[in-house]
Regions:
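Boundary/entry segment of secreted carbohydrate-active catalytic domains
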Residues: 1-32
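Solvent-exposed loop/turn segments at secondary-structure junctions
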Residues: 9-13, 30-34, 66-71, 100-104, ...
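Surface-exposed substrate-engagement region within the catalytic domains
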Residues: 19-22, 79-173
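Conserved beta-strand segments of the P-loop GTPase G domain that flank and frequently precede/overlap
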Residues: 25-28, 63-66, 97-98, 141
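Acidic/histidine-rich, surface-exposed loop or edge segments in extracytoplasmic proteins
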Residues: 31, 59, 108-110
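Second-shell loop/turn segments in exported
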Residues: 35-40, 64-71, 108-118
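Glycine-rich anion/phosphate-binding loops
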Residues: 44-45, 68-82
């Protein structure tokens, strides 16, 4: 069984010299901010984390934190992600994180939590299709309840990574 980590500017892995039990790393490429303008942002540590993982000869995947609530936003996010990862050595899956459950006055009034289940399914199917078209192996990271209530049985050709907030996660293959 393989063991891996997820790293980002929010969740730095401090010691890349102590990775004897780590086989792969997922580096956050970027995210859509859940502010009112839903700004797409590059993770400020993407290139550093990506290069450190390559230097340590780890298998590398990436992830993007989606806030898409319609197909136009999903298209914009996927194009943004594809632009970030083009020409990168990605030999592990590309994870789309579907966990936007923010909905307050401060944040954008539309969140994935409040999106119609059929529309959210359509968004995820679009994201999977686009990643497949570009030769990537997509994985969807989401809450267990969202998986059971929205995706289970409706998307069968990919893996899901169910968020249980642990530091390390075991092989997703």
């Amino acid at each position: 069984m393989q063991k891996g980590i997820m790293v980002s500017s929010d969740n730095l892995f401090k010691d890349y010299n102590n990775l004897e039990n780590i086989d792969f790393v997922f580096v956050r490429a970027g995210y859509t901010d859940f502010n009112k303008s839903k700004t797409k942002k590059l993770d400020t540590k993407f290139y550093e984390n990506y290069n450190l993982a390559l230097d340590k000869k780890l298998n590398v995947g990436v992830y993007y934190e989606s806030c898409a609530t319609n197909l136009k936003e999903a298209e914009d996010e996927i194009n943004y992600l594809l632009d970030i990862i083009k020409d990168k050595k990605i030999n592990y899956p590309v994870i789309i994180q579907i966990e936007d459950d923010h909905n307050t006055i401060i944040y954008h009034p539309n969140s994935q939590k409040n999106t119609n289940k059929d529309h959210l399914l359509e968004i995820v199917l679009y994201q999977i299709k686009k990643l497949n078209e570009y030769g990537y192996n997509p994985v969807i990271k989401t809450y267990e309840t969202w998986y059971k209530n929205i995706f289970k049985g409706k998307i069968t050709n990919i893996k899901f990574f169910l968020d249980n907030n642990i530091e390390y996660f075991d092989d997703i293959y």
